[in-house]
């Protein structure tokens, strides 16, 4: 009942932000018919611009902020560094193209995200919302600039790591969950990429930055649309009947990765990941788990309990003896190889996607018949790329009943280079059956692509050069992956090692000995 009240109150509260701003109203003077003096002025409030998303008049965000460099690019828009003209303070501005918000659901998603950001703003570990603006072409969301970078990047750069450090990070993540749930919000997409550090300082605060899939909790409602990211999704999401408990599961997956460097459930394809989430036992046997404290493992188990009714609540997690400030988390360094595994986990998918893309670009017409026509049918403007809108429309024509969120996830998975559209090779890579892509002749062509000098080996320089050319990873990360693939330790990757990397799972080559 408390949640329902909070939700209703928060919705009423949010709607105020979209009222017409308190600016000078138009003043109309009506001359008197019998008197030369004017009657008192009648204020006529400005009318909201027709067909707005935010329900208020258009405003020029550039009259308040000056825009600088691009910080990132996503499916619906671009994030820029911006500076408040009056104060000189720097913020981030996400500019969302209205042209890409083609459906009523798209527009409602943006409204809801802004409402939730404003509702949660000012709370610890949550990015501060500054304001929302709308003009003819875009919706602009101005928020706190988190200049400290991604969570995992900071951990890896630091080079040493303890259970206590993992507990501090996990406490911040679970605190976000606790705040969201207390304030009537379910996040639905907790993952490390959605957390940034506020500054470059050593003890910078961790901030949750993305609420695009979040919803206001409706008491008694069971949610059914599949949302989230594969490694972090809770089993009840896959069963299409879930509530806010899913956020604790996702936080538990993050904790498992913080302690071991890899996710608890993995596979080469999404279906395999989902099967593991539903049925497999959590691995506490392989390294580094024997050296991790029993208290830490106890918390992971209780956060990753498959029955949501038996899973700890966010408030209970914060009270766990391992997680509490000054609690049982050890200050003894965790094996440094965990950092290496964490780095590989972040980059391995990019490496394999790159190789698969090379293979897809070399498939012959016979192997891709049907897929080429499907691509052309979806590419309605003949641009050579498929936009989100075209993908959604094309899937609908094929009889797909995927939700908006599921189509967005398909788009993100297929869009390897992250430019917001799917090119022909990306489409083939995503739709071709994996066993065809992994046939010997295709793997050999991919091997030859990297083996520029036809020496029969891929050197570190060759693979680094190819991956940097396609902006798929940084040099240090690539070196570590090559070291893992190079099982005979001769400093090069031969064809057998390359095939093993492509066909094998992520977990086995990344296990600590």
Curated annotation (Swiss-Prot):
Residue sites binding Ca(2+) 1 per the record: 379, 381, 383, 385, 390
Catalytic activity annotation: L-seryl-[protein] + ATP = O-phospho-L-seryl-[protein] + ADP + H(+); L-threonyl-[protein] + ATP = O-phospho-L-threonyl-[protein] + ADP + H(+)
UniProt-listed PROSITE patterns: EF_HAND_1, EF_HAND_2, PROTEIN_KINASE_ATP, PROTEIN_KINASE_DOM, PROTEIN_KINASE_ST
Claim: Transferase is one of the keywords in the record: yes
Region Autoinhibitory domain, annotated ranges: 329-359
Domain of life, source organism: Eukaryota
GO CC list: cytoplasm; nucleus
Domain Protein kinase: start-end pairs: 65-323
InterPro entries: CDPK_Ser/Thr_kinases (IPR050205), EF-hand-dom_pair (IPR011992), EF_Hand_1_Ca_BS (IPR018247), EF_hand_dom (IPR002048), Kinase-like_dom_sf (IPR011009), Prot_kinase_dom (IPR000719), Protein_kinase_ATP_BS (IPR017441), Ser/Thr_kinase_AS (IPR008271)
Activation and inhibition: Activated by calcium. Autophosphorylation may play an important role in the regulation of the kinase activity.
Binding site for Ca(2+) 3: 451, 453, 455, 462
Residues reported to bind Ca(2+) 2: 415, 417, 419, 421, 426
Amino acids binding ATP: 71-79, 94
Annotated residues for binding of Ca(2+) 4: 486, 488, 490, 492, 497
Alphabetized UniProt keyword annotations: ATP-binding, Calcium, Kinase, Metal-binding, Nucleotide-binding, Phosphoprotein, Repeat, Serine/threonine-protein kinase, Transferase
Molecular function terms from GO: ATP binding; calcium ion binding; calcium-dependent protein serine/threonine kinase activity; calcium/calmodulin-dependent protein kinase activity; calmodulin binding; protein serine kinase activity
Free-text function comment from the UniProt entry: May play a role in signal transduction pathways that involve calcium as a second messenger.
Domain free text: There are 3 contiguous domains conserved in the CDPK subfamily: a kinase domain, an autoinhibitory (junction) domain and a calmodulin-like domain. The autoinhibitory domain (329-359) inactivates kinase activity under calcium-free conditions.
Family that this chain belongs to: Belongs to the protein kinase superfamily. Ser/Thr protein kinase family. CDPK subfamily.
Name of the protein in its database record: Calcium-dependent protein kinase 2
The organism of origin for this protein: Zea mays
